[in-house]
Amino acid sequence: MAQNSSLIAAELEALRQTIRAHEYAYYVLEAPNIADSEFDALMQKLRALEAASGLPIPADSPTQRVGGKADNRFRNVAHHIAMLSLDNVFNADEFADFYRRLQEQLSPTTAISLIAEPKFDGLAINLRYENGILQRASTRGDGITGEDVTQNVRTISTIPLRLNTHTPPDVIEIRGEIYMPKKAFYALNEQAAANGEKIFANPRNAASGSLRQLDPRITARRQLAFFAYGYGEITNYQLPETYEALLEQYRAWHIPVCSLHQKAATLPEALAAYQQFAKQREQLPFDIDGVVFKVNRFADQQRAGFLARAPRWAIAWKFPALEKTTRIEAIELQVGRTGAVTPVARLQPVTIAGVVVRSASLHNAREIARKDIRVGDTIFIRRAGDVIPEVVSVVLEKRLPDAPVFAMPEHCPVCAAAIVQNEDEAVARCSGGLHCPAQRVAALIHFASREALDIRGLGEKLIQQLVAQEFVRTPADLFCLTADDWASLPRMGKKSAHNVMTAIDAAKKTTLARFIYALGIRGVGSVNAQALAAHFGDLAAFMAADRAALQEIEGIGDVVAADIEHFFADEDNRAVIAAIVAAGVHWSTELTKKIIDAPLLGKTVVITGTLPSLSRAEAQKRLETLGAKVTSQVSRQTDFLLLGADAGSKLARAQAFSVPIIDEAQLQTWWQHYGNAV
């Protein structure tokens, strides 16, 4: 019986190997060596044999690509080694500067060997293989933590569930890009349009949306593909000497690798490679938005090192934004939190690089005058960096003879208050302050934001309703709303009303730094707010400070000091602050005074690993309360590394930079001494 089981197991494994070889030939090499009907017959045979054998079906069997129930969420997973992004350049001069910096650092007298490859426009992914078997796939996320999308990635036919080798590494994380080929994208949108469903703006969005489907069977139908271009954690595997050799190793393992990469041994060769990719761009079967250049030798990569969020040994040279022509149908004005009145062009919809553009900021009246932009004009528009719509110029030959010259109105379009403009500022501003509904909404959104009072559940739509119903004029009014007020809002149930009231009540307990930031003083971001709180230690002292006293603080220049002084000179602002404090918003003055002497004040801290009792969010909040700035990457500017269990590459980098290491116990000690008044 045991012998029969062994024979059956061997037969099953041989059949699986045969099918894997055919999958690789079909999906990766695009050179099928059997007919579709023959492949289907092999799959049917494998399913039947697996069912009849009674043996456990391994996770890497070709029959296990699609299946499983729909999930209602994606689990967050921490990357063992951070997934860094790349710095960008946008022209030959900037690229030449990058190349010269590398040459000075690595080899002043000889050329540097680079690899040029397409910058794929998709979704970065980390594939973790353990003993050759795909165990987990996770998105980049914020570079530190991503989402577990393993079940969906298993449905992508170009990604092997098992590496094609008898001697796989114990662990290897293969990094690359999941993308949607243009052909699949067009077919998907055609089908969606025929069904009356929402269409995707571009292949990148389609790839991202398809990968994050809760039902893996939907992902399986979306024809996603993958290219490898890097690595993460590796155990029991010796990297080859060059990146080019690693790609060859991936290819041998049946990991898809783009064949378009090319060597560039000199700066002129690198410039030529960029031009070649730019010419090929439109003809490629997948979207690219630039060219990535990497140092070929891994030893040279290690010597070049890393910046805070990107490697020094690689750069992404983005393509110039694609330009199209369209027509300006109207110029509307938007009013922001600080009263800035921004003209916005409403455009005849135009598709640029797969994205429908309907509007573009014109920034200010001076910019409109400089470009002589008028309603009715035909204009060239591009997506700067392939992202932000930008009006480049006007096609004067197509201008209508009666096209009116734009003039900034004298009064705010929202509240009718006077629009004012300082001579030294390009931005015009509404003088209405919190009397202006548009400024009121923006100020309330800022006040409730995560870095300010962090009022959970109080979003833009809810704030707009409160302002429209005239329940709220200033942030102080939020703390006076009753259950009846909340219940009277459209679609506001009792539970939702209770939740938001609870969140508002919880937000009363805050820190002086958060409160200062929440006030929305022009030029005072979260970092400046922390510095101001630490310096003055008391709200009254901060409000009484003159411009000279403010400028003693690092980061507070003459302009910001003047803005702070102007803010507190307004009696309405002072009245709102008094009302907020009277409503119960408070912080520990003793804590703020203690923090001035705290060892973490003004320090940069990185967290790595799993802490014994605190979550990462809790630890970060305590660090920030104690005056620290928490960042995600270790650099020479890092002051402390907060170390937990199962730390990744950050520990090694911290040791290389001689960064002092602290643990949760040390943080708890500081918290007990400096922060327990919160």
Swiss-Prot record:
Concerning InterPro entries, the annotation shows: BRCT_dom, BRCT_dom_sf, DisA/LigA_HHH, DNA_ligase, DNA_ligase_AS, DNA_ligase_CS, DNAligase_adenylation, DNAligase_N
Single Gene Ontology MF annotation = DNA ligase (NAD+) activity
The protein here is known as DNA ligase
Enzyme nomenclature, EC number: 6.5.1.2
Per the record, the GO terms for biological process are:
DNA repair; DNA replication
Q: What does this protein do?
A: DNA ligase that catalyzes the formation of phosphodiester linkages between 5'-phosphoryl and 3'-hydroxyl groups in double-stranded DNA using NAD as a coenzyme and as the energy source for the reaction. It is essential for DNA replication and repair of damaged DNA.
Active site at K119
Alphabetical UniProt keywords: DNA damage, DNA repair, DNA replication, Ligase, Magnesium, Manganese, Metal-binding, NAD, Zinc
Provide the BRCT domain boundaries.
595-678
Q: Which reaction does it catalyse?
A: NAD(+) + (deoxyribonucleotide)n-3'-hydroxyl + 5'-phospho-(deoxyribonucleotide)m = (deoxyribonucleotide)n+m + AMP + beta-nicotinamide D-nucleotide
Q: Which gene encodes it?
A: ligA
Q: Name one GO cellular component term.
A: cytosol
Task: Specify the species.
Answer: Dichelobacter nodosus (strain VCS1703A)
Q: Which family does it belong to?
A: Belongs to the NAD-dependent DNA ligase family. LigA subfamily.
Q: Which Pfam families does this entry report, sorted A to Z? A: BRCT (PF00533), DNA_ligase_aden (PF01653), DNA_ligase_OB (PF03120), DNA_ligase_ZBD (PF03119), HHH_2 (PF12826), HHH_5 (PF14520)
Is Transcription included in the keywords of this UniProt record? no
Cofactor names: Mg(2+); Mn(2+)
For NAD(+), which residues are the binding ones? D36, S37, E38, F39, D40, S85, L86, E117, R140, E177, K294, K318
Task: Fetch the PROSITE patterns from UniProt.
Answer: BRCT, DNA_LIGASE_N1, DNA_LIGASE_N2
Q: Which residues bind Zn(2+)?
A: C412, C415, C430, C436
